[in-house]
Amino acid sequence: MSSAEADSVPPEVRRQWQELAETVREHQFRYYIKDAPIISDAEFDALFNELLALEERHPELRVADSPTQLVGGAGFATDFAEAAHLERMLSLDDVFDTDELIAWSNRVENEIGKDPHYLCELKIDGVALSLVYRDGRLERAATRGDGRVGEDVTLNARTIDDVPERLSPSDDFPVPALLEVRGEVFFLLADFEALNASLVEDGKAPFANPRNSAAGSLRQKNPAVTARRKLRMICHGIGRTEGFSPKTQHEAYTALSVWGLPVAEQTARVRGLAAVQERIGYWGEHRYELQHEIDGVVVKVDDVALQRRLGATSRAPRWAVAYKYPPQEAQTKLLDIRVNVGRTGRVTPFAFMTPVKVAGSTVGLATLHNAAEVKRKGVLIGDTVMIRKAGDVIPEVLGPVVDLRDGTEREFVMPTTCPECGTPLAPAKEGDADIRCPNARSCPAQLRERVFHVAGRGALDIEGLGYEAATALLKAGVIADEGDLFALTEDDLLRTELFRTKAGTLSANGTRLLQNLQKAKKVALWRVLVALSIRHVGPTAARALATEFGDLDSIMSASTERLAAVEGVGPTIAAALTEWFTVDWHRAIVDKWRGAGVRMADERDASVPRTLEGLTVVVTGSLAGFSRDDAKEAILARGGKAAGSVSKKTDYVVAGDSPGSKYDKAVELGVPILDEDGFRKLLAEGPPETPAD
């Protein structure tokens, strides 16, 4: 850079660039070398893109050792021996929205023509690894490093079950003399959780997320430690080869699979950008169903000759890009851990955190399940923690960022008495991880939660009886427990401030609540069973019981063995039912509801044909003429079983709009799939008769 060029950059801009470049390099060091980042991927991407934009505006700043021009951990010395890659191991450029994806596609297609074939691959959130095979035998494994030279981790890589020592020959794909293959090392979520649990048990700091744990495990000094950690690998590219020249990336993956190397079964070959966007949308919706974490979809031009024409920059190929989903993980401060008492008395610790945006919503609260889970995760009050929110799933605290501790953090101590009523807490039975408040009858927290639960959509579905109303009715003393709900009168509601106008008359909400309570007296029996707050009894078991017995008295008088024999019930739920009905005040609730006119038996419609007797039907997607509950009840009313998952025992799958993974499973197993019209015909006529031999 000449002095004239250097002088053209304003001093304040140069200072901004120097500070930003130094910050980015510090975070790269923590990520690639220490395996202990202190900011989220999204926060790093924002810093990196800010640096990139600054260099776009002032190209003079784009020097050779800028973080934007280097790959991964370039320039950092480590304790592992160096290993030179035979062909440069590049990174990927990222795009974060549809406009950026279209801009990338336009650049590609302007060079090679319209609507090429693309490969869409899951972007696994792990650590990159390069393997070299000579004459089919594993010679060396190396991390990415700076893209030219990485770290030799051969001994550790050999402990990974997915990495074969020798390649399997094939007539279609002879084993090449030289094969350099690239892939990603990662943890399955279940294995990551088991590893963290064992670390905490040994008094060691847990990993903050699966990516960090994969990097840390691959770079262990003792290969025996790596061997115990159940690392996995997926191959996603090739480097230098001798004796193998695939025409497409897709062909390369087929060969790798034949040779015994792991490739992702979800990879799709599509034509044109519209099909790419469809795959990105699909995995954006279904990524939480995978057994491992992904943070996006990698899009590649499939034709190898076209890849060569497009070439690469100093850090990434021009023929591939990573579409990154909004972050599902973020870092925030754990301000406190407080406990909540639920409707069955379970005492649950919750993490109260500085609100942070993650997976499209603001999160400030997450469950920690029980004291054992708090210990297993190794979190302290005051920690900076990693949190995850996957779709509509309740946010989860993954673990602490140990490097950011300053000594002010403190351990959480589970209370020994109920914070609501003062009753000593204890497990329901020996060995339970959860502790409970045994004062079920009069603990204020349990009363509130049970009254609120009665009105839930999965129970009696009483609009107007929310958490605020449940609290107000109990506080006013117009109900002692949920048994009094159906005896409520206008005078009772007038004594409750929430339902009284300033003029002293009943509010519109109060009138609606009384009307909705009357309507709730005529609901299906399974809803009544759910509303009683019997432990373990949810909608599925309740439906099975209602279908089998038809009325509450028969359920109450049935033996535990008889209840357990009902499909979908089993011994645990059966024991909970028997125990619940032996308690006097529980039976008093049933008697109060019965006395108030709540229907305790299903009225079987003799006109409804038993067309689905003995059949198992699964519904997936949205149906125009049925809600999900309506469809299930239609199946049950005709003698069928409405299952929640697809198996070889499933007789039919009904697929509406936007079906999920159940549809894919049905295709895989060859289960008959019906649209809504086919479903209506099945309900009316039953399955077609099998012709006699």
Curated annotation (Swiss-Prot):
UniProt KW rRNA-binding keyword: no
Record's keyword terms, sorted: DNA damage, DNA repair, DNA replication, Ligase, Magnesium, Manganese, Metal-binding, NAD, Zinc
Full protein name: DNA ligase
Organism expressing this protein natively: Mycobacterium avium (strain 104)
Gene Ontology terms for molecular function: DNA binding; DNA ligase (NAD+) activity; metal ion binding
Swiss-Prot/TrEMBL catalytic activity: NAD(+) + (deoxyribonucleotide)n-3'-hydroxyl + 5'-phospho-(deoxyribonucleotide)m = (deoxyribonucleotide)n+m + AMP + beta-nicotinamide D-nucleotide
EC number, UniProt record: 6.5.1.2
Any GO CC annotation of this UniProt entry: cytosol
